[in-house]
């Protein structure tokens, strides 16, 4: 059913925030009834000069599954944001959630450990109110964790047509894992009007020198190395996979990028010292293995010092050229196909390798299952058919 939320239902006002629903009791599951999808509509909740959070998850061992959040508003003209789900607790699972057609970030994780964001979709979100309606603060998913907030994972999620980025790990003090996640058409409206930054996976960074050096050292060191594996980036306005001025390398394993402005952009800042911490330089200390890309609009790979990175079996160093004939389908409409019955990502032909592709068995073993004599390149392993 559809539930129209009202301002009198706001559970708590705290500083600049209005928290509509506050989940602070441990060990409770909030699950949609089988074959039903509760939809919570927040379009009528507009407290003046407040950042709106639909669900604040402060407790531990909470499981939320199978609901939709739509219409979350922004009411502040200056720099601000609203959020569908804000996570502060630990050992929580957010599963099969849809956050769409609003102005808010889908999932915004600030603290807590061992949280799993599983098979969630964030799409068609644009803040049309603040900062001239550029939409520069509305990501699909974000993790901006405090020290000690470890082992947090995004798995099987999709982010598309979010006005800023698909996934954003800026100002993050602990390593995060993103696996089997998709990001497409971020930085655009649903009719492809340009909005915010538009990176698919924005992995790291500390505001490129706008934070004081002492703040970075005190609150974020040792700088984390995040992991992005078996992920897909398609048609994002800027980078498909982007290191965002990070002060360390990341792990980029078995990803696929297609038709982004730049498919892989490894831009770092030069070094963590008072002089260089805000100065851009080619990426260093990244580990890129078994990655695949095709048809970047401007460049396949940029901003990388290959001599200071670990590079193994990536398409940009092969003695062969990736072509459309390597793929069963380039039909982008399959990206928004319905999820499978268990909530997992749709199993389509899109960007799956053909039986004759030279990209099959072109990878190197990184500890995950593969079908034949070696892993394939990219996020989809050839299954004997496609």
Per-range role (PLM):
Residues 319-386:
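C-terminal accessory segments
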Residues 9-20, 44-56, 77-86, 101-109, ...:
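Extracellular beta-strand/beta-solenoid scaffold signature
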Residues 180, 224-349:
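Predominantly extracellular beta-rich ligand-binding scaffolds that present long acidic/polar faces
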Residues 31-33, 57-58, 65, 70, ...:
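Feature marks extracellular polysaccharide-active and adherence modules
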Residues 3-24, 346-353:
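N-terminal, post-signal-peptide segments of secreted/periplasmic proteins
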Residues 20, 25, 35, 58-60, ...:
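Parallel beta-helix/beta-solenoid
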Residues 11-18, 174-179, 247-254, 260, ...:
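C-terminal/domain-terminus segments
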Residues 4-9, 22-78:
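Right-handed parallel beta-helix/beta-spiral solenoid domain characteristic of secreted/periplasmic
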């Amino acid at each position: 059913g559809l539930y129209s939320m009202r301002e009198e239902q706001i559970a708590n006002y705290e500083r600049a925030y209005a928290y509509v629903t506050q989940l602070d009791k441990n060990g409770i599951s909030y699950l949609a009834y089988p074959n039903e999808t509760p939809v919570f509509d927040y379009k009528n909740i507009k407290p003046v000069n407040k950042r709106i959070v639909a669900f604040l998850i402060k407790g531990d061992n909470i499981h939320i599954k199978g609901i939709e959040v739509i219409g979350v508003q922004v009411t502040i003209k200056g720099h601000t944001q609203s959020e569908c789900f804000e996570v502060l607790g630990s050992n929580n699972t957010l599963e099969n959630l849809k956050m769409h057609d609003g102005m808010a970030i889908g999932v915004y994780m600030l603290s807590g450990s061992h949280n799993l964001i599983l098979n969630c979709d964030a799409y068609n979100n644009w803040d049309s109110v603040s900062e001239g309606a550029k939409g520069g603060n509305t990501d699909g998913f974000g993790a901006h964790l405090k020290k000690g907030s470890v082992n947090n994972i995004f798995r099987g999620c999709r982010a598309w047509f979010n006005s800023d980025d698909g996934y954003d790990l800026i100002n993050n003090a602990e390593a995060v894992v993103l696996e089997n996640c998709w990001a497409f058409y971020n930085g655009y409206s649903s009719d492809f009007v340009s909005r915010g930054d538009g990176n698919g996976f924005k992995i790291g960074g500390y505001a490129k020198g706008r934070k004081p050096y002492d703040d970075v050292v005190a609150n974020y060191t040792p700088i984390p190395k995040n992991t992005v594996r078996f992920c897909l980036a398609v048609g994002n306005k800027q980078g498909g996979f982007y290191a965002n001025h990070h002060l360390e390398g990341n792990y980029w394993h078995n990803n696929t990028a297609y038709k982004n402005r730049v498919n892989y952009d490894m831009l770092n800042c030069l070094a963590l010292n008072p002089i260089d911490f805000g100065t851009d330089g080619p990426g260093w200390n990244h580990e890129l293995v078994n990655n695949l890309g095709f048809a970047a609009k401007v460049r396949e790979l940029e901003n990388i010092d290959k001599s200071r990175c670990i590079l193994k079996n990536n398409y940009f160093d092969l003695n062969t050229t990736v072509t459309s004939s390597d793929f069963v389908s380039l039909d982008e409409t399959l990206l928004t196909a319905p999820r499978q019955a268990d909530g997992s990502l749709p199993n389509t032909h899109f960007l799956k390798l053909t039986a004759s592709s030279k990209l099959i068995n072109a990878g190197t073993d990184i500890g995950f299952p593969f079908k034949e004599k070696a892993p394939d390149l990219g996020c989809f392993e050839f299954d004997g058919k496609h």
